[in-house]
Regions:
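Catalytic machinery of carbohydrate-active enzymes
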Residues: 1-241
């Protein structure tokens, strides 16, 4: 049996939130699944040690310029999925587009959120109700990312992670402006932590100009000597930290 999961939200955090639901489907049918995900999710790096996921297929959409954008892009995606010969698909959205793509790809059994009901969908509760209704399973939202012990040990040595300090990883970026925390709030958080703890802060962010502005302001603050920026690293290098 070959199963496809479609999750088209753009962010890394969104992808991680859906991870327990993806794994629950794999466990239910006893086979690892394939996932159609946005490239921005960095899923190929984050999920490389996940035994429940067989392969990552990237959905390449970028403001009408991506491989899978528009009518031609949909046709390309249909042919790609048809060649995979999936038996079932679970679509974690209410998109008619993905419903039609799945049907035209020859997938016989399609499970999907109710069509045309995107508004006011709670990201976790909607997914929980979806799998409970379709498969009769209850899924807790407790995502776990598997990281091998050797990578963790190497990161401790490389970044001098001392357990006498509070070592705090701060995700100061975000997949959009509404998901980014202003730098003054992050700096205030650092003040509160450092009032009572010896702390070191690892700053995880991307190269987006708005994220770099946040990083620069933090690195120009009085906490700069306590901060280690991680913006030049891949996700696979950051995770063991």
């Amino acid at each position: 049996m070959k199963i496809l999961i479609i999750q088209n939200r753009i962010g890394i955090g969104d992808m991680i939130i859906f991870l327990p639901f993806i794994e629950a489907i794999s466990k239910k049918f006893g086979v690892p699944v394939s996932c159609l995900l946005k490239k921005n999710t960095k899923a190929d790096q984050i999920l490389k040690n996940n035994k429940f996921i067989k392969e990552i297929i990237f959905l390449e959409r970028d403001k009408q310029n991506g491989k899978h954008d528009g009518f031609k892009g949909s046709i390309d995606l249909i042919f790609s999925l048809r060649n995979c010969k999936f038996d079932k698909v679970f679509i974690f959205n209410s998109s008619l587009r993905f419903n039609l793509i799945s049907k035209l790809s020859g997938i016989k059994k399609i499970y999907q959120y109710p069509l045309f009901k995107k508004n006011k969908q709670h990201i976790i509760i909607t997914a929980q109700r979806f799998l409970n209704k379709e498969l009769g399973i209850n899924v807790e939202s407790k995502p776990i990312i598997n990281i091998d012990n050797k990578s963790i040990s190497n990161a401790k040595l490389k970044y001098n992670i001392d357990h006498n300090f509070k070592n705090i990883l701060l995700g100061i970026g975000g997949s959009g402006p509404t998901k980014r925390i202003p730098p003054n709030i992050i700096i205030k958080f650092m003040e509160l932590i450092c009032d009572t703890n010896a702390a070191k802060f690892f700053l995880a962010t991307g190269k987006d100009i708005d994220e770099q502005i946040i990083l620069k302001e933090i690195m120009n603050s009085k906490f700069k000597d306590r901060c280690i920026p991680l913006d030049n690293l891949n996700i696979v290098d950051i995770l063991p930290i």
